[in-house]
Amino acid sequence: MSLNLDKKIYLRALSLISRKKIKNTLSLSIKTRYIESEIFRYLSHILISIIIGLLAGAGGIFFHTLLEFTKNKFHPENLQSSININPIIIFFIPSLGALITSYMTYLFPEIAREKGVLSVIKAILIKKGYIPFKETLFHFFAPIISIGTGAPLGPEGPSAKIGGGIGSYISTLLKLNSNDIIMYTSAGGGAAISAVFNAPIAGVFFGIEVILLNDLKNRALSALIISSVVADILARHALGDKKVFVIPHYDLGDYNSYFLFFLLSIICGIISLLYFKLSYTFKQMFNEKLKITTPFGRLIPVTLVFGFFLLWDYDLFGIGYDTINNLFINKFSLMEALKLLILKICFLALFIQAGAFGGTFAPSLSIGAFAGYSFALLANKFFYTSIDPVAFGLVGMGGVLAGINSIPLTSILLVFEVTGDYKFILPLMLSSIISYLVIIYYRGGSEYSIALMDENIDVSKKGDIDVLSKAPVSSIIKKDMDIVKAKTSFNILINTIISAKYGDIFVINDKEQFLGIITLKDVRQALLDNDLADLLIASDLAVKLPAVQPQDSISTAIKIMKEYDLENVPVVNRANGKLEGIVTHRDIIEKYFSIVDDIALSEHLIKSEKAK
């Protein structure tokens, strides 16, 4: 009897010692795997960022090269110098491009609608960064045709679309999670901007300030920096290390000039407001008064009017960088500068609302340059000052760029990088910030946030978290999860995990208090790493993770899911530590769309009531 008792005690002690050794071995194995996985994760992150920088940069370079080729072929001055053509041909060149892009829009209306920077932001906010590759291809060729045949728009919007599309395609191809897709989509957009403008710092801040709407994460920043640097190196190698603008010597004046810079900053904000007012007026004209819905009916009449003015002044053609360079070497009188300033504002608004393909960065730079230049000439003529028009033209570029596009930081860095001159950084900062504040004050939001609201997308920079911030966890709690006690044997755990309804097992003690989660991966790893895995019990494998309370918002659960890469989050009563249920990723998605649908329905009903 005593012998049998001693044997049982011995076996029990051996079992406890073995289980403790297994648990320690398993713990060491998990730590080792964690370190190895973290190293692999960071190396993969760097490698993917480099690949996206190379491909997005190559896409931007190819786009830039084809655009320059098309623009040079169809530029009126080049046509007249190479062949003796009738001026009527020049008149119809913009309409030819409009005819082709309108037909493309007619064939693919849904794809054509997702254009420019705004579509990349929307993809990140509501599609988890996913951009179909056919969209990328469409918006590669359409802007080349549109801008190359004279549309006074810029290459940066299409470039961001191309780079973002490449980043999205690569990360989708690699089957990365949604957070990584968002990160690499923004990195691709920033890399393309970096390549097109030879401005890596501006490319990084463009990704942060515009595409991510200032929602910055550390890994997102590193991806943006790596991709932008790689893209810029590639662009400098392929296109040469040259600046977009050739800036002659200029004089900033003394500190008394800062009062005039301040006045110019306010004028830049007013000019930006004028652009938005005109843009809204033209939009109402097309939609409400004329009720033109076809792309042909909107764009071709605009290009015919543009063609008439183009016969009068070739400086209206295309992107306008050469015109800015000519402005800075004093090729324009005051009246010529004012005339081009007014026409560029009007045609930018017209082409955008008519459905042409291109961005607003380059036209903003051109409008700002003419605004600052004209301001200086007017001040010298009527107030007997002696300020330098070139200096004020440079400062005006930053002011209007920041005002029209709501990007104060990016505008400062972009103008600084494309000019390569540090001297005017202080007045540039002043004009960018003040112009931006004028817009925010009078419009109540940035250009992109207002555009999103116009499309009934009331999702701010935090995406689905903001929408669900007022929805409690208790509204989607599940109580039919698989639960095991702490002392449950390993063999029972295997059978339970195989048939687990939500893929995880939740471990509790005898008082029903939550101890941790066991995943299929944990069980599989225990089998691989240990010959004596059968001696393990549930508490040995349970991983203690943060939980939410029933009254917490669903956004809290989302944060935990993102941080720990979970599909399910336990719901625990903090007062007694008891497990009350779980929240699943699928239920969160369903709740999100339910709330969005309810908001859309409410807005529709309100609009209907107001219409009555």
Question: Predicted segments — roles?
Answer:
Residues 456, 469-481, 488, 522, ...:
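Bateman (tandem CBS) regulatory domains
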Residues 205, 413, 515-523, 580-589:
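Short hydrophobic beta-strand motif reused across regulatory alpha/beta modules
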Residues 484-501, 508, 527-530, 534, ...:
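The conserved cystathionine-beta-synthase
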Residues 1-470, 474-475, 479-480, 484-493, ...:
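Alpha-helical transmembrane segments and immediately membrane-proximal extracytoplasmic
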